A protein has these predicted regions:
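Substrate-binding/catalytic cleft of secreted carbohydrate-active enzymes
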Residues: 104-282, 315, 319, 335-337, ...
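Active-site-adjacent substrate/metal-binding segments within catalytic domains
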Residues: 7-8, 24, 32-166, 280-310, ...
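Substrate-binding clefts and catalytic carboxylate motifs of secreted carbohydrate-active enzymes
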Residues: 229-397, 410-413
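A general secondary-structure junction signal
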Residues: 45, 201, 342-344
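A broadly tuned preference for mixed-charge, low-complexity surface segments
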Residues: 23, 125, 158-179, 222-223, ...
């Protein structure tokens, strides 16, 4: 047995340092080294509790090293749509998540397999919600023995990473019973119950999936939308289970003009499709996110793509910040965390991202960074209240809060403050 006295513990971002150790193993034969390996690990203890919220629905709540953890983060699919992300490039992506004050990434359907992803999550204190390769349309597989062998290899290969916080069987569904039982029993044996195995990503202590749209902040403060997707009831429950722990909620996120120019030919820049042109296309993502309509309603019609992109960043900030702040407002009373869909783009896109494919931060990036700061002051646009949100381990006393109002040109127009 390896005994470490007074170890420095591994902590997620915002709760302490992600301390790591390196163990060097050497195998010798007749006094000569035949093989050696360095193993990096962190010392931590994950725990999980179901705590009923205000609507008496159990909420999955995470603890690490005895400390209750408020989850803030986002979902990843692929690292890059042509599988060209390797090595140090993962560090750039993970550091951007740390900079947004996130502490968790959910690997949707386990799309990322590179060791470097986990290494940098360990290094920067980003916990990993680790899915297996099943989702709502496919909860069974053609060759179950091959699936089981891959699952066993995955757990054995990754279990030493302190960043892995939970294993999850399937996205928005449960694995077929035989696979579900295998995964639960295998993880209990191979990971020694160090991390929870959870069958489904959005049920059983979790509050569903969605919304996916650009609702104003006031909307999110007033309703969790846990029974809705694209504003069409009822999914996945048919009733509202409160804010709870949400593993998916997302919006369209328009990139900056500098990035749009890189993947849209100039002849297609302008004009954008009108609401009238799209009114009968119910499956159009633009319609489902209400993006163009909201930009035009709040900031006026644009005369060019560049002007529209500039205004879009203001909406990106407002909507992303509003979602996180609505969950902040209910912290420990009704909910335990929020993971947005998605925080990382695998390709050039107009939806589901914080920074874009070219690493240019959108307004959503700055909205997330602000709302997720470890000590945050926020305004509830529904009841006009001000609240200080503290997700650190330290009590806050004698703090001075200051609010400053700027116009759209960045000029200060009013300010006031208070000590409490």
């Amino acid at each position: 047995a390896l005994v470490i006295r007074n170890p420095k513990l591994w902590w997620p971002n915002g709760y302490g340092e992600p301390n790591l150790y390196t163990c060097k193993l050497t195998c010798s034969v007749d006094g000569k080294i035949s093989d050696e390996k360095d193993i990096t690990f962190g010392i931590k203890k994950y725990e999980y509790k179901m705590i009923n919220n205000v609507v008496n629905y159990p909420v999955l709540t995470f603890f690490i090293n005895g400390q209750k953890i408020y989850l803030k983060g986002g979902n990843w699919g692929m690292s890059e749509y042509l599988l060209r992300c390797h090595g140090k490039e993962y560090e750039t992506k993970i550091k951007l998540h740390k900079d947004m004050n996130y502490n968790m990434i959910r690997l949707w359907t386990g799309c990322v397999t590179d060791d470097e992803f986990y290494d940098y999550c360990d290094k920067y204190g980003i916990m990993v919600w680790n899915d297996f390769w099943l989702y709502v349309a496919y909860n069974d597989v053609a060759e179950p023995e091959a699936f089981k062998a891959n699952a066993l290899d995955k757990v054995r290969r990754l279990r030493n990473h302190p960043s892995i916080a939970i294993w999850c069987g399937a996205n928005e569904t449960h694995p077929a019973p035989d696979l579900d039982n295998y995964l639960r029993e295998m993880i209990a044996q191979e990971d020694k119950n160090d991390r929870m195995y959870k069958s489904c990503s959005n049920q059983d202590g979790l509050s569903g999936s969605g919304w996916w749209g650009n609702q104003p902040p006031k909307h999110h403060f007033e309703t969790s939308g846990s029974n809705l997707a694209f504003n069409k009831p009822a999914y996945p429950y048919g009733i509202d289970h409160g804010y709870g722990m949400r593993t998916e909620i997302g919006t369209a996120t328009f990139p900056t003009f500098e990035s749009v120019k890189l993947f849209i030919p100039q002849e297609s820049w302008w004009p954008l499709p009108t609401d009238e042109q799209l009114k009968d296309d119910d499956d159009n993502v633009w319609n489902k996110h209400f993006f163009g309509k909201e930009v035009n309603t709040q900031f006026g019609e644009s005369s060019s793509l560049e002007e529209f992109c500039e205004k879009a960043q203001l909406l990106n900030i407002e909507v992303m910040k509003g979602m996180y702040e609505a969950w902040n407002d209910k912290m420990w009373n009704d909910e335990a965390g929020l993971l947005i869909w998605m925080s990382h783009p695998a390709y050039p896109s107009f939806v589901w991202q914080t920074y874009d494919y070219y690493y240019d931060p959108t307004g959503a990036y700055w909205g997330a960074k602000k709302a997720c700061e470890h000590l945050h002051l926020q305004w509830n646009s529904s009841n006009n209240s001000i609240k200080a949100v503290n997700t650190t381990t330290k009590d806050l006393k004698g703090a001075y809060a200051k609010a400053t109002i700027y116009n759209l040109n960045g000029k200060e127009v009013a300010a006031y403050g208070r000590t409490k």
